[in-house]
Structure formats: C-alpha cells, structure tokens
Amino acid sequence: MATQRASGLLQRLAQGSLVKQILVGLVLGILLAWISKPAAEAVGLLGTLFVGALKAVAPVLVLMLVMASIANHQHGQKTNIRPILFLYLLGTFSAALAAVVFSFAFPSTLHLSSSAQDIVPPSGIVEVLRGLLMSMVSNPIDALLNANYIGILVWAVSLGFALRHGNETTKNLVNDMSNAVTFMVKLVIRFAPIGIFGLVSSTLATTGFSTLWGYAHLLVVLIGCMLLVALVVNPLLVFWKIRRNPYPLVFACLRESGVYAFFTRSSAANIPVNMALCEKLNLDRDTYSVSIPLGATINMAGAAITITVLTLAAVHTLGVPVDLPTALLLSVVASLCACGASGVAGGSLLLIPLACNMFGIPNDIAMQVVAVGFIIGVLQDSCETALNSSTDVLFTAAACQAEDERLANNALRS
C-alpha cells in the first residue's frame, strides 16, 4: 500500500505542471533563506547541480539536433532562418534604441570610486568580431568542452550537409542519437523545481538584496526598459509578422522560457528549455534546431539594454554632452557589442568600455561602471537572460507561424 502511494506521488510529480512546481520551489527557497541562512547556503548545491546538468547537456543537444535536422532535411523543404535572423537583429537594435530613450527620459547617476575591476575588456569592436570569427574555426571537441556554440553550429551544419550523402542507416542512427539526447534533456528539466529551490535559497542567503538599494534608480531604469521591450516592443514586432494578437504567444514564452532563464542566468543552460517549448508549440524542427542555439549567441536585446543604460549613466554622471546622432550611433554600437556578448567572458558588462570609449571616457572609469554592473548583477543578469532567452523562442515561433499562415492562404487561393 505504501509503495503504491509512493509511486502515485512520484507519478503526479513527474506529470504535474512544471510551472506550478517551480513556483512552489521559489516560495520554499525564499522561506528557507529567511529561516536559516546556513541551510540555505548548503542547499545551493542543488541549484549548482541543476545548472551544471543543463550546461552539460546543451552543447551535445545542439550538435545532435542541428546535425540530424540537416542530414534528414528533404530537398525542397523550406526553413525560416532568414526572417528569424532579421527579427533577431531588428529586436536587438530596437532594444538599444529603447534604452537610449529611457536613459534620456530617466537619467541615472553612478557612485564611482577610485578603484576599478582588475579585468581586461576587449579593446574594440574589431576584436569582438575577430573573436566570433575565430570561434567558428574552433576544434569540435574544444567547442563542445567550452560550450562554444558558434563553433558547435559550424561543425553541426558541416557534418549535417556531409551526412546528406550518407546512407539511410547512418541518417537513422544520427536521428536516434538526437532523440536520445532530447530524452535526457526532458529528464533534466523535470528537476527544475529542485534546482530553482537551491538557486533562490543560496542567492538570498549569500548576497541578499541590501546592496541593491543604493542603485535602486539604475535598476528601475534597467528593468523598466527590459519590461518595455518584452511587453511592448517585442509584441509589436511579432504583430507585424503574424498580424494577430501577439500577447498569448508573448506570455507563453515569458512563462515557459523566461522563468527558467531568470533563475539559471544562462542562455546556454536555457537552450534545452527553449527546444522543448518549440516542440510544445509544434514548430518546424528543422528551423528551431538551428535558430534557438543561434539566438543564444546573437539575439541579445537584454545585453544591448545593459550596455546602453550603464554607458549613458556614466555619461550623465560625468556631465558629457550627448547629441542625437551620437545617441543613435550608440544604439548601433551597443547592438553590435550585444551580438558579440556571448563570445566574451563576463558577457555584456565587459563590453561596456567599448561603448564608453565613444564618449572619451577613460578605461579606469569605464571599469568602475563594470564594477557597478557586477554589484547589481543579481537582478540585472537574471532579467537580461530572461529577456534574451524568451525572445529566441518568441521570434522563432512568430516566423514559423507567419510562414504556416502564408502557405495556408496560398493553398486556399489555389
């Protein structure tokens, strides 16, 4: 009897609503951090294991899915990568432009000290682009070990095209391997409530939010701008694409993808989650198996906002005058920097000195701005990743649904 009850409970947990279970884990994590700080720090291991498992499986998932989809691609079957890529770039630039408007409407100032982070940022945009190009010719084993998704994509696409000329047995083997890795991903994702419980507990216990109050205005501007992009700018772009109410799709992506990304704070770790959501939305597998890992690399609306807002906060603090053409140029520079953020250790924060260089701000002061970014990183990085990752699915779904409707309309006319 006890065994039957236990198996019934496990079955309900395995088949229950993952979002509801995550909310329970979130509440329990907050309560544990409030009741016992040492215990909360100890259960942080659960969160570390969960994020580690996602990061471990994501590179293999991308390699196998992309390779399988291209190897088994039928001649004449169309994918929607080009419109998705256009949406990625347009969305990132729109986010940078929104951040400029927000920063001028609600100017922030920083408390800059004489000390700076002992970190060497990229010296220019050319170096960032060079790093991206070099990552394309990375050794495949090295790319998998270091989660270099540009390198993984290049090898997966190349091997996929090569395997098109292979026999059906080989293609079936690759497809079976892809399905096996997908099953492993689903298994890992079921542990999300436990992982988020550990992440929330340890974060509140070790950092807390007391240090964030000194930067409340800056955080409000940053997060407010990200909310504007998530709830206004992105829906407008999706409406332009699908010509109907975009909000059901927007909220589904924020709920199913953004929540995970907020707590894991890793676009790479969220790739399996996004892949599962694309499958749930019944999108074309040949399309999303390429667009999702590509989006995790270049679709960086949140990074563009972070770079723009923190740069203009430094500009306002130092009293540097900014005209409209310079502000527009900053949007372009921030967009380019954001697209290269995944190839830089430290991500968007370490690309701030590139944008600061436009205004003649010395490197030591620019690195102090980076230090401010690290202080508010608990919330900034979480919100940035949630926006970046949920937008990957949103734009992929919008492009796929728009193409499906176009084909359906053409069929009706004929």
From Swiss-Prot:
It catalyses: L-serine(in) + Na(+)(in) = L-serine(out) + Na(+)(out); L-threonine(in) + Na(+)(in) = L-threonine(out) + Na(+)(out). It is found in: Cell inner membrane. Keywords: Amino-acid transport, Cell inner membrane, Cell membrane, Membrane, Symport, Transmembrane, Transmembrane helix, Transport. GO terms for biological process: serine transport; threonine transport. It is a multi-pass membrane protein. It holds the Pfam family SDF. GO terms for cellular component: plasma membrane. GO terms for molecular function: neutral L-amino acid:sodium symporter activity. The keyword Secreted does not apply. Involved in the import of serine and threonine into the cell, with the concomitant import of sodium (symport system). This is Serine/threonine transporter SstT. It comes from Salmonella schwarzengrund (strain CVM19633). The lineage of its organism: Bacteria, Pseudomonadati, Pseudomonadota, Gammaproteobacteria, Enterobacterales. The gene is sstT.
